[in-house]
């Protein structure tokens, strides 16, 4: 019998795998009708730009404090553009990502990458010096023993 095997010869990991699969399938079955209900509710009040062609009437601008509190489109990015849908001629707001915001996030990411690289470069240098000292100490002991 394998080490860590159960009574029937299956490893314990096999039992855990079957339990995990059964639990996952049960969750998927339980959530499927809920997702369909959410989709049916959201499609009735969905913005026109999801289903139609649209024209941007105002470019991407930062939201004012009032817009942030009252317009749900401002919540995710803090920027909004005004659009007009072609078929329904409805004017709506659409959340957008500002080029300035993207540039700021890019340089912040680059700064973090450079900082992490510098930290690990310093760690490599310190470790290399430790190993060099140990090697020199071994050589010195070998020379002394002669």
UniProtKB/Swiss-Prot annotation:
The chain crosses the membrane at residues 106-126. The keyword Phosphoprotein does not apply. Interacts with AURKA, AURKB, BIRC5 and INCENP. May be a component of the CPC at least composed of BIRC5/survivin, CDCA8/borealin, INCENP and AURKB/Aurora-B. One of its GO terms (cellular component) is centrosome. It is found in: Membrane; Mitochondrion; Cytoplasm; Cytoplasm, Cytoskeleton, Microtubule organizing center, Centrosome. Undergoes N-terminal proteolytic processing, removing a peptide of about 1 kDa from the N-terminus of the protein. It is a single-pass type I membrane protein. This is Protein JTB. One of its GO terms (biological process) is mitotic cytokinesis. Residues 127-146 are cytoplasmic. InterPro entries: JTB (IPR008657). It comes from Mus musculus (Mouse). Residues 31-105 are extracellular. Its main location: membrane. Belongs to the JTB family.
């Amino acid at each position: 019998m394998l080490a860590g095997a159960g009574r029937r010869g299956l490893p314990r990991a096999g039992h855990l795998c079957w339990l995990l699969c059964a639990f996952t399938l049960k969750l998927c079955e339980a959530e499927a009708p809920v997702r369909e209900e959410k989709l049916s509710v959201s499609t009735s009040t969905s913005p026109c730009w999801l289903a139609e062609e649209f024209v941007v009437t105002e470019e991407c601008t930062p939201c004012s404090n009032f817009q942030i509190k009252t317009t749900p489109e401002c919540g995710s990015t803090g920027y909004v553009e005004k659009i007009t849908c072609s078929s329904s001629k409805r004017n709506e707001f659409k959340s957008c990502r500002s080029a300035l915001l993207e540039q700021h996030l890019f340089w912040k990411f680059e700064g973090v990458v450079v900082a992490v690289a510098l930290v690990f470069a310093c760690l490599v240098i310190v470790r290399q010096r430790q190993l060099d000292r140990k090697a020199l100490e071994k050589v010195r002991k070998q020379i002394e023993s002669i």
